[in-house]
């Protein structure tokens, strides 16, 4: 149905009680370099994208997600 698998099933999870400790879900919104994916790739609505961005930043500060991935 969707070309991008992220668009298919993560929109509902963002609406539910998602918090910064759900690293397995939040890592789906981060690329291989550790950058937050844009809305056009995630398929989220504006309010959902802002929530995910805020939670990813909180998880980074809490050292649950890295700021940069794979940099030598």
From Swiss-Prot:
Pfam families: Ribosomal_S18. It comes from the Eukaryota. HAMAP family: Ribosomal_bS18. Keywords: Chloroplast, Plastid, Ribonucleoprotein, Ribosomal protein, RNA-binding, rRNA-binding. Signal peptide: none annotated. InterPro entries: Ribosomal_bS18, Ribosomal_bS18_CS, Ribosomal_bS18_sf. Part of the 30S ribosomal subunit. One of its GO terms (biological process) is translation. It is found in: Plastid, Chloroplast. One of its GO terms (molecular function) is structural constituent of ribosome. GO terms for cellular component: chloroplast; mitochondrial small ribosomal subunit. Belongs to the bacterial ribosomal protein bS18 family. This is Small ribosomal subunit protein bS18c. SUPFAM superfamilies: Ribosomal protein S18.
């Amino acid at each position: 149905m969707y070309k991008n698998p992220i668009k298919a099933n993560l929109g509902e999870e963002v609406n539910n009680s998602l918090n910064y400790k759900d690293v397995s879900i939040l890592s789906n919104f981060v690329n291989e370099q550790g950058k937050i994916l844009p809305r056009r790739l995630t398929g989220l609505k504006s309010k959902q994208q802002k929530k995910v961005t805020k939670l990813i930043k909180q998880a980074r500060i809490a050292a649950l997600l890295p700021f940069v991935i794979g940099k030598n």
